[in-house]
Curated annotation (Swiss-Prot):
Annotated organism of origin: Populus trichocarpa (Western balsam poplar)
GO molecular function (one): metal ion binding
Listed name of the protein: S-adenosylmethionine synthase 2
Residues holding L-methionine: 56, 99, 246, 277
Main location: cytoplasm
Family: Belongs to the AdoMet synthase family.
GO cellular component terms listed in the entry, alphabetical order: cytosol
Known partners and oligomeric status: Homotetramer.
Cofactor notes: Binds 2 divalent ions per subunit. The metal ions interact primarily with the substrate. Can utilize magnesium, manganese or cobalt (in vitro). Binds 1 potassium ion per subunit. The potassium ion interacts primarily with the substrate.
Its job: Catalyzes the formation of S-adenosylmethionine from methionine and ATP. The reaction comprises two steps that are both catalyzed by the same enzyme: formation of S-adenosylmethionine (AdoMet) and triphosphate, and subsequent hydrolysis of the triphosphate.
InterPro entries (UniProt xref): ADOMET_SYNTHASE_CS, S-AdoMet_synt_C, S-AdoMet_synt_central, S-AdoMet_synt_N, S-AdoMet_synthetase, S-AdoMet_synthetase_sfam
Catalysed reactions, as listed in the record: L-methionine + ATP + H2O = S-adenosyl-L-methionine + phosphate + diphosphate
Gene for this chain: METK2
Superkingdom, taxonomy of origin: Eukaryota
EC number: 2.5.1.6
């Protein structure tokens, strides 16, 4: 049996890039909660003792940007300079302007267009992917890397491993078998965890705790064997972390946010963007389409692409590839998808309820992945049953 190795990585909510994603989405939530028609393009950057939010926001909402920045950093665990940032003492810079009137008239006619007339907020192409290798219909390498990161945060916050600090990265290599285009995981080849820690803990304690409290609860035993390789804090020391260790920027972790390197990516980031930004809404609707294709048994694995022009509601193209796993021809699946899904941005916002903020709705997406999550707020994960109409004889 010929197998191959494939690797996916993830980062924790305390990674500086992910801190920025969460701040941007916390601001989006606050705007949408008060004004569902808010137009938000919010970027965040951070370095030692500083967080800056900048971009274009047009909203009727009354939003205290500085307060949101500090509370988001605090809830992640950045409560002192020792851990990489002090949420209460750091400098918060704000440079937010209104959306360009040129863009506003072209996309939504200064809020006068009906939902079906709203144009795409920009050009671009987005991909959705699904695979039957996990219950989530997501790639196993990505699922395991993501869950390891989430578990690291859990044992830090609940006190199981008090030596942990907010920053951290994970990476999982899975050995796969290609079964006529479908991906079948055989075993976990390598597990890598690099986590920020305090001064008190030894490398042996770190390795023992990570194996017992992080890896064991996350990776099913059937995937681990005596040949599985573990790299646990291989650099030997990771005390300085968060924005003190590295600069952070919104939209720098787009593969972690999506499919861990599987499928394809159009390059557009998600966080800090309202649903007229097709980078986000377009990617969400094609995930729903791809997941629905696999969940409905039309294929074992598939990718869906959609593309847009600024100001134009209808997509320029829709593409489906089932990697040879389709039960019916890809062309037929494409026709079903085009019939069952409305790819116009204004209609995506309605069908996936994307104008609803609050309750950390989008903040939740900004760490540990936008897809494969079991949460009613992740409306794009709801499967639409798809059936092939048998052609008339």
């Amino acid at each position: 049996m010929e197998t191959f190795l494939f690797t996916s990585e993830s980062v924790n909510e305390g990674h500086p890039d992910k801190l920025c994603d969460q701040v941007s989405d916390a601001i989006l939530d606050a705007c949408l909660e008060q004004d569902p028609d808010s137009k938000v393009a919010c970027e965040t950057c951070t370095k030692t003792n500083m967080v800056m939010v900048f971009g274009e926001i047009t909203t009727k909402a009354n939003v205290d940007y500085e307060k949101i920045v500090r509370s988001t950093c605090r809830s992640i665990g950045f409560v002192s300079d020792d851990v990489g940032l002090d949420a209460d003492k750091c400098n918060v810079l704000v440079n937010i302007e209104q959306q360009s009137p040129d863009i506003a008239q072209g996309v939504h006619g200064h809020l006068t267009k009906r939902p079906e007339e709203i144009g795409a907020g920009d050009q671009g192409h987005m991909f959705g992917y699904a695979t039957d290798e996990t219950p989530e219909l997501m790639p196993l390498s990505h699922v395991l890397a993501t869950k390891l990161g989430a578990r690291l945060t859990e044992v830090r916050k609940n006190g199981t491993c008090p030596w942990l600090r907010p920053d951290g990265k994970t990476q999982v290599t899975v050995e796969y078998f290609n079964e006529n285009g479908a991906m079948v995981p055989i075993r976990v080849h390598t597990v890598l965890i690099s986590t920020q820690h305090d001064e008190t803990v030894t490398n042996d304690e770190i390795a023992a705790d990570l194996k017992e409290h992080v890896i064991k609860p996350v990776i099913p035993e059937k995937y681990l064997d005596e040949k599985t390789i573990f790299h646990l804090n291989p650099s030997g020391r990771f005390v300085i972390g968060g924005p003190h260790g590295d600069a952070g920027l919104t939209g720098r972790k787009i593969i972690i946010d999506t499919y861990g390197g599987w499928g394809a990516h159009g390059g557009g980031a998600f966080s800090g963007k309202d649903p007229t930004k097709v980078d986000r809404s377009g990617a969400y609707i094609v995930r729903q389409a791809a997941k629905s294709i696999v969940a409905s048994g039309l294929a074992r694995r598939c990718i869906v692409q959609v593309s847009y022009a600024i100001g134009v509601p209808e997509p320029l193209s829709v593409f489906v590839d089932t990697y040879g796993t389709g039960k019916i021809p890809d062309k037929e699946i494409l026709n079903i998808v085009k019939e069952k899904f409305d790819f116009r941005p204004g209609m995506i916002a309605i069908s996936l309820d994307l104008k609803r903020g609050g309750n950390g709705r989008f903040l939740k997406t900004a760490a540990y992945g936008h897809f494969g999550r079991d949460d009613p707020d992740f409306t794009w994960e709801v499967v639409k049953p798809l059936k092939s109409e048998k052609p008339q004889q």
